[in-house]
Amino acid sequence: MCIRDRVTGEELEKSVRAELLSLSAENAMVVARHLVCINLYQDTDPQLAHKHGIAAAHHAGRLAVVRESAGYAAYRAGHYEIALKELRAAHRISGDVSSLPVMADCERGLGNPLKALSLAGSPEVKRLAKPEEIEMRIVAAGARRDLGELEAAVVTLTCKELNDETDEWALRLRYAYADALDAAGRKDEARQWFAKCAELDEEEFTDAAERAGE
């Protein structure tokens, strides 16, 4: 597929380029350019980014970094079955667990909340870094809601990290918790937590302030 001439592949981080060294020089350049295009288009044209992900994986299917990039591109484009396939492959190759929350969310997207919960309860989850651990909580709570288990969703999100105000995931966690409370019919508590969420949301990425006043 067509790639702009100005995209050279040199734009990739050195650590990613280093993982392409096992490829021939010509193939490495092709793959690198496709990976750059994923980054270029992932926000503005996720379907095009996904196509570049497919192309990159076609040229370098044995490299975890390539399969993972293709998986994330497919996920952002809403192609959950493909995303799950690519992320599973990357996980098998590298053993890296950081993509487990996205894999669980893919299962939700495919209408498999029980599979999402099974993944959320797997022993490997204990190896997640804190941001991914929080993301897995949010995904698991969503799976509970998919099953109609609204109180269980609240319980899933109840954790000491709700008091955190500085980490990048704090806003998402508080919002998910407030939304779960609201869905469970606990309106007063939900408003309180939407207000706490709004305190962190200075740039108004969410509608927390509005929902706190409902």
Regions found by a protein language model. Give the residues of each.
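Short, small-residue-biased leader/transition segments that mark boundaries at the very start
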Residues: M1-I3
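Alpha-helical segment of the N-proximal tetratricopeptide repeat
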Residues: E11, S22-H58, S69, Y75
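Generic helix N-cap/helix-start motif at coil->alpha-helix transitions
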Residues: E26-H34, A49, A60-R67, S94-V102, ...
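Structural register within alpha-helical repeat arrays
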Residues: C37, S69-A70, M103, A140, ...
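Structural motif corresponding to the intra-repeat A-B loop/turn of tetratricopeptide repeats
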Residues: Q42-T44, A77, L110, L147, ...
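TPR/TPR-like (Sel1-like) alpha-helical repeat modules
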Residues: I93-D96, V125-K126, V155-E161, D182-T206, ...
